[in-house]
């Protein structure tokens, strides 16, 4: 049985865009580099040729990976979700109980998780601690530096 990959509609669109870029822009550019490098003669000592072939291999591998993830995608339109209980797709505002610092995280699938963009994987320790909780609740998360406590200040669906 094929395992579905949960993702937001935004995450699906981002993967689709990357796939199109790799297929229609990167692939032809790499093929052109290979042809140009091949024209320089002896391939056994042609570093430019080997680098282009390696880039082609990497690109084709990523294309296959993207096609697989898109084929198995279980797209969830977060804007149609609601409720006070935190689940996949929720955007959660947390207050660190030690520092009073506010942070905002959206709980997404592993494929689209990116901490720099405020998106955490549903399988992360923080997301696992948040799932099923409501605004006003305090959660404790085991972090590399020890346990951290956060108050759930807001739950949004956007």
UniProtKB/Swiss-Prot annotation:
Q: Name one GO biological process term.
A: regulation of DNA-templated transcription elongation
Q: Name the Gene Ontology molecular function terms of this record.
A: DNA binding; RNA polymerase binding
What domain of life is recorded for the organism? Bacteria
Region forming the signal peptide: none
Record-linked InterPro entries: GreA/GreB_C_sf, TF_GreA/GreB_CS, Tscrpt_elong_fac_GreA, Tscrpt_elong_fac_GreA/B, Tscrpt_elong_fac_GreA/B_C, Tscrpt_elong_fac_GreA/B_fam, Tscrpt_elong_fac_GreA/B_N, Tscrpt_elong_fac_GreA/B_N_sf
Per the record's keyword annotation, is Transcription included, yes or no?
A: yes
* Entry keyword annotation includes DNA-binding: yes
Segments forming a coiled coil: 47-74
Tell me the keywords, alphabetical order: Coiled coil, DNA-binding, Transcription, Transcription regulation
Q: Which family does it belong to?
A: Belongs to the GreA/GreB family.
Sum up the protein's function in the record's words.
Necessary for efficient RNA polymerase transcription elongation past template-encoded arresting sites. The arresting sites in DNA have the property of trapping a certain fraction of elongating RNA polymerases that pass through, resulting in locked ternary complexes. Cleavage of the nascent transcript by cleavage factors such as GreA or GreB allows the resumption of elongation from the new 3'terminus. GreA releases sequences of 2 to 3 nucleotides.
Stored HAMAP family:
GreA_GreB
The name on file for this protein is: Transcription elongation factor GreA
Q: What is the originating organism of this protein? A: Bradyrhizobium sp. (strain BTAi1 / ATCC BAA-1182)
